[in-house]
């Protein structure tokens, strides 16, 4: 069993989740993910790693409460335990001196892109971080990014903080301050990663996205997380989760995600979250 050190809602519907897992914290790297279960009957949920403390033996993730199993996670308190905390899984993000790197995070991806930005800065890169949200009340960890970035940009749809607009305005925004990235890394919801990949492709900006499909075992056996990259079948859990965003068949990926909607809804119906229906 794995002890919960902290579980708190940091912005509406997003929770910071800190678990005592010494073996995982000892070997985890930026870009890795873990799989958890809230109880013996719960689904296996893949969560990107947002931070870790090797001395304390803890691992931090940011998760969104969207279904029955994440609702169970959201009810956990410090001192509670969970039966499953598997990791680190997946390939770590490539870290080296690329030159100028743009790190874009939205929603739960703000958390998962943080250790990537930190490691890239430590590798000698110029790191420019962009945090994107619908409104200022959905932003978090901005102070952490200032410590690991040469500059932090904020974009909100309603203009309550930073630049008013959306990710489609990023190229113009960077052009105005003379920034041309050698590498762009995007962590967030599927639409954000897809849209940013579409924006950067004609510009020739190499773009790496952190894919988050449904998974079961996390070791490539179930095949649920497969996707087409460069015309070849890949498994997000073992070949990724990082992939070249310009090579992903986004239309196929979105269709596969939709096919699991009934199975995702059913656990929520059977949970105690009847208020959703």
PLM regions and their residue ranges:
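Ferredoxin-reductase
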Residues: 1-80
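Glycine-rich beta-alpha junction loops
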Residues: 23, 40, 134-135, 213-215, ...
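A generic structural signal for residues embedded in beta-strands
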Residues: 36, 84-85, 227
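Short, surface-exposed secondary-structure boundary micro-motifs
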Residues: 39, 87-88, 230
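Short, Lys/Arg- and Gly-enriched loop/turn segments at beta-strand edges
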Residues: 42-51, 89-99, 237
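FNR/FR-type flavoprotein reductase catalytic core
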Residues: 68-216
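Local cysteine-cluster metal-coordination motifs and their immediate loop/turn environment
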Residues: 112, 212-242, 271-277
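Short Fe-S-cluster ligation motifs
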Residues: 235-239, 243-277
């Amino acid at each position: 069993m794995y002890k919960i050190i902290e579980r708190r809602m940091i912005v509406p519907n997003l929770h910071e989740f800190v678990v005592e897992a010494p073996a995982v914290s000892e070997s985890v790297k930026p870009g890795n993910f873990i799989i958890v279960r809230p109880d013996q009957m719960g689904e296996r949920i893949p969560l990107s790693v947002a931070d870790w403390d090797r001395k304390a033996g803890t691992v931090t993730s940011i998760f969104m409460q969207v279904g029955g199993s994440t609702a169970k996670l959201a009810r956990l308190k410090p001192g509670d335990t969970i039966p499953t905390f598997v990791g680190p899984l997946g390939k770590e993000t490539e870290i080296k001196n690329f030159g100028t790197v743009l790190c874009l995070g939205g929603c739960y991806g703000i958390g998962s892109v943080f250790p990537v930005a930190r490691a890239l800065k430590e590798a000698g890169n110029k790191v420019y971080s962009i945090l994107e949200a619908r409104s200022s009340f959905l932003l978090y960890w901005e102070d952490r990014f200032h410590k690991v970035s040469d500059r932090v940009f904020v974009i909100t749809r309603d203009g309550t903080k930073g630049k008013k607009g959306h990710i489609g305005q990023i190229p113009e925004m960077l052009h105005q301050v003379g920034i041309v990235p050698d590498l762009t890394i995007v962590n967030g919801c599927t639409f954000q990663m897809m849209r940013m990949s579409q924006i950067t492709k004609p510009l020739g900006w190499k773009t790496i996205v952190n894919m988050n499909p449904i998974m079961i075992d996390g070791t490539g056996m179930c095949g649920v997380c497969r996707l087409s990259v460069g015309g070849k079948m890949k498994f997000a859990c073992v070949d990724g989760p990082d992939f070249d965003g310009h090579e992903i068949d986004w239309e196929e990926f979105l269709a596969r995600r939709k096919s699991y909607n009934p199975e995702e809804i059913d656990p929520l119906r059977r949970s105690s979250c009847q208020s959703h229906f």
